[in-house]
Amino acid sequence: MNDTIPATGHLLGAADIRRIAADAGISPTKKFGQNFVIDPGTVRRIVREAGVTAANHVMEVGPGLGSLTLAILETGATMTAVEIDPPLAERLPGTVAEFMPEATSRLTVVNRDALTVTPENVPDFSDDASFTLVANLPYNVATPILLTLLERFDNLGSFLVMVQKEVADRLAAKPGSKIYGTPSVKLAWYGTAERVGTIGRNVFWPAPNVDSALVKFTRYQADDPAAPGTANSTDDGTQRELVFRLIDAAFGQRRKTLHAALKTIAPSEAFSIAGIDPTRRGETLTIAEFTALAKAIESCGDGDEAQ
């Protein structure tokens, strides 16, 4: 049990959400994948699972009408909310001022597409201090947002996100399972992920057609021996690019053997160097094995000349 989150009574319920939306002339849109959480217990659960305390600096993507925002601020944390929809970004500070006025100084709102966010345009996260992402992500772009932020922010140390249940299962999938795929392996390059709970449809407005789940992620520390390759070093990203290229090729032709799927990238000797049987399929490889194969390709020269 986490005792760091006091129940202040300042969180949004269904009536609050609908009133705020009506006052601001806002309706949920499919374009931005908007489904607003209307249950205070759910947002407190998300924050509790994330382990947010007053010492944390939090990024939220897609704050919507502010349900989760207020739950994060309730802990005493400082946060930046990244919202793509201008009317919602404009409304959010007013909602915080109304329901939790003492927290307004701890909130920064950035009206921007999360896929375009960089340390340069979100200066609160531009230093080396670790931060956490806590979000109810738009289901149609959840995976691209996570991988983009992990690539651009070396100091994104952890996240707790709510996504479509099927997406959560894929993100946390392990080698050999039917749902293990590109998102699973690429996320494993950066750290470890697990599904930590499910969320029903009745806590949203409007109610989605799918169930949701929570995914918790912890990034590898720079000195963690489990970190594949140079995932958390200051390299120029070339090794990650090759590893991700291998992953895309292997899962783009999922039923083919590695030898067939990677024939334009990996020379035959690379498999021998890496100790990987080329008759295996990509769905059986761990991120460590993809990394070992990338290193072997580099030792053989230009992978584009594979025969």
Curated annotation (Swiss-Prot):
Subcellular location per the Swiss-Prot or TrEMBL entry: Cytoplasm
Gene3D superfamilies: Ribosomal RNA adenine dimethylase-like, domain 2 (1.10.8.100), Vaccinia Virus protein VP39 (3.40.50.150)
PROSITE patterns assigned: RRNA_A_DIMETH, SAM_RNA_A_N6_MT
UniProt key word Transferase: yes
Function according to Swiss-Prot or TrEMBL: Specifically dimethylates two adjacent adenosines (A1518 and A1519) in the loop of a conserved hairpin near the 3'-end of 16S rRNA in the 30S particle. May play a critical role in biogenesis of 30S subunits.
Family under the similarity heading: Belongs to the class I-like SAM-binding methyltransferase superfamily. rRNA adenine N(6)-methyltransferase family. RsmA subfamily.
Catalytic reaction equation(s): adenosine(1518)/adenosine(1519) in 16S rRNA + 4 S-adenosyl-L-methionine = N(6)-dimethyladenosine(1518)/N(6)-dimethyladenosine(1519) in 16S rRNA + 4 S-adenosyl-L-homocysteine + 4 H(+)
Protein name in the entry: Ribosomal RNA small subunit methyltransferase A
SUPFAM superfamilies, sorted: S-adenosyl-L-methionine-dependent methyltransferases
Residues where S-adenosyl-L-methionine binds: N35, V37, G62, E83, D113, N136
Species this chain originates from: Bifidobacterium longum (strain DJO10A)
HAMAP family: 16SrRNA_methyltr_A
GO cellular component terms given for this protein: cytosol
Enzyme Commission numbers on file: 2.1.1.182
Keywords (A to Z) from UniProt: Cytoplasm, Methyltransferase, RNA-binding, rRNA processing, S-adenosyl-L-methionine, Transferase
Molecular function, one GO term: 16S rRNA (adenine(1518)-N(6)/adenine(1519)-N(6))-dimethyltransferase activity
Pfam families cross-referenced by the UniProt entry: RrnaAD (PF00398)
InterPro entries linked to this entry: KsgA/Erm (IPR001737), rRNA_Ade_diMease-like_C (IPR023165), rRNA_Ade_Mease_Trfase_CS (IPR020596), rRNA_Ade_methylase_Trfase_N (IPR020598), rRNA_adenine_dimethylase (IPR011530), SAM-dependent_MTases_sf (IPR029063)
